[in-house]
Amino acid sequence: MRPPGPRAPGLALLAALLAAPRALAEAPHLVLVDAARALRPLRPFWRSTGFCPPLPHSQADRYDLSWDQQLNLAYVGAVPHGGIEQVRTHWLLELITARESAGQGLSYNFTHLDGYLDLLRENQLLPGFELMGSPSQRFTDFEDKRQVLAWKELVSLLARRYIGRYGLSYVSKWNFETWNEPDHHDFDNVTMTLQGFLNYYDACSEGLRAASPALRFGGPGDSFHPWPRSPLCWGLLEHCHNGTNFFTGELGVRLDYISLHKKGAGSSIYILEQEQATVQQIRRLFPKFADTPVYNDEADPLVGWALPQPWRADVTYAAMVVKVVAQHQNPPRANGSAALRPALLSNDNAFLSFHPHPFTQRTLTARFQVNDTEPPHVQLLRKPVLTAMALLALLDGRQLWAEVSRGGTVLDSNHTVGVLASAHLPAGPRDAWRATVLLYASDDTRAHAARAVPVTLRLLGVPRGPGLVYVTLALDNPRCSPHGEWQRLGRPVFPTAEEFRRMRAAEDPVAEAPRPFPASGRLTLSVELRLPSLLLLHVCARPEKPPGPVTRLRALPLTRGQVLLVWSDERVGSKCLWTYEIQFSADGEVYTPISRKPSTFNLFVFSPESAVTSGSYRVRAVDYWARPGPFSTRVHYVEVPAPSGPPRPSDCERC
């Protein structure tokens, strides 16, 4: 499969990016990027999501292990280049059952937890492992010394089990964390006083340490309202800073990271402002924690995941998520504390949407529970916010100097137009120099259908390299919104196969084919960005070798005549990819390419008009220079009905 031939840069950009009406009254923004001027490391601190199963939590397995969630996690894990790495999950310990035998003490059944963690690992994801829940309601009071000791043994047993199952190198990457939001007192049937919470914390800490000192543990994962509110949050910090360890009697208890929850109330900058105020107070009260990593592992723009909001359906949400990331990497000068760059920033948006709001809840995918087929089945669509995570994944580890100005005035990241830019130095023959410039146009939760922002982007300092090319990817509502297509189709409750095909055609950004980069090392693009929108410029030198092989190809059933293919790019070795070529063979002998738009997402729904899906599949990467990599190992698929039994919606209204 070969990328389309290069076109004149001006005409190509007009075709792809100037579809918006001209913003006659607006002065243009000027974006300058210097590829020769690296500022600092750019860590991908945003690669996390999360969700909560519904009540009753003792039946969390019905949600966590449901077919719907298996599909959802396939989508989450299919973000290219590890663009989402962690799924922070509430009530994990409710997946364990406990039994007490005379003379034997407590014994545990880990079958459901094994299944969920296996599912994450299959999708190359890590758990954000909250030590939350009471197996079979055996733990009720953490001021009871016997229960505290038993809890330590449970945590140690759990950690040893998964070190043995997966290896320490994998489990040591997990973020073990306290019970979620302890000051909200969602403990189900567990009595949790301040002292009980501190005893619980020490039992978790020492249980993990007994399994391996390499395991990471932090908390408290809550709002940290100013004292005297949030007593468990502040009490835990006081305990870890000055208190006595329940088990060892030593002063001070380890706290590997401080996790807090600050959401935006509809504002991007409000997230950062709250974080800065809280962290400044923590560092003032507890100076030993000045260098302790800070996580905001629920940093959503708005509380209430199930609350339907039109902006959550389309590129408005996607652009706002990118804007929040940029504000954390480049804090506005007026906000002072530039030292606060969180070690982790997570959106809590891996929930499953439910009827009648498939697109407008705080989710990465849109779920349709299609009940007019026999048997009923589930379909997911990729929302623009999930595609935005794929664009963020194209950023690399060296942040470049970049500046946005308008009318001669330099603008910080708390404005409508912003930028993140990065560069990468090669690490092998399948790798080469590259640079990424990611522009956002975002007015937070507000969309302006008739407004476009004129922008001039100037990139300079690009070094000479073999086969140097550039590619643009644009994400906006007119062309890249499955929700918009759904509305144009009349908002069908049970879309047909053809309607799903039309909605999926809007999932990917609009890609302009690779073009030669100017020999001068400078490039100027004049564009008009829809408000909201994202625009990514990717500049790549040609590696010595073509891409490596696609691995882990799987086929998952959806319904008659439709199959989901998902694969891994872990051995592909290059980010400068134009598409994945997917080939199908009904007889396992003669393979033909499947016709589709260019896409580098590691997932594809095959839904041919012929409805013939039984056969063999293979996939290979194609780079910007039209060089294919090796095919994956083929996978053979025989059509079978997908599992049924859709899960209930989650109950966590304030998440």
UniProtKB/Swiss-Prot annotation:
The keyword Ribosomal protein does not apply. Its main location: other. Disulfide bonds join 540-576. Residues 1-25 form the signal peptide. A smaller 63 kDa protein probably arises from IDUA protein by proteolytic cleavage. N-glycosylation contributes to substrate binding and is required for full enzymatic activity. Keywords: Disulfide bond, Glycoprotein, Glycosidase, Hydrolase, Lysosome, Signal. It holds the Pfam family Glyco_hydro_39. Detected in testis (at protein level). Expressed ubiquitously. GO terms for biological process: carbohydrate metabolic process; dermatan sulfate proteoglycan catabolic process. One of its GO terms (molecular function) is L-iduronidase activity. Glycans are attached at residues 109, 189, 242, 335, 371, 414. InterPro entries: FN3_sf, GH39_as, GH39_C, GH39_cat, Glyco_hydro_39, Glycoside_hydrolase_SF, Glycosyl_Hydrolase_39, Ig-like_fold. Alpha-L-iduronate binds at residues 90, 180-181, 263, 298, 304, 348, 362. GO terms for cellular component: lysosome. It is found in: Lysosome. Belongs to the glycosyl hydrolase 39 family. PANTHER family: ALPHA-L-IDURONIDASE. It is linked to Defects in IDUA are the cause of mucopolysaccharidosis type I (MPS I). This is Alpha-L-iduronidase. It comes from Canis lupus familiaris (Dog). The gene is IDUA.
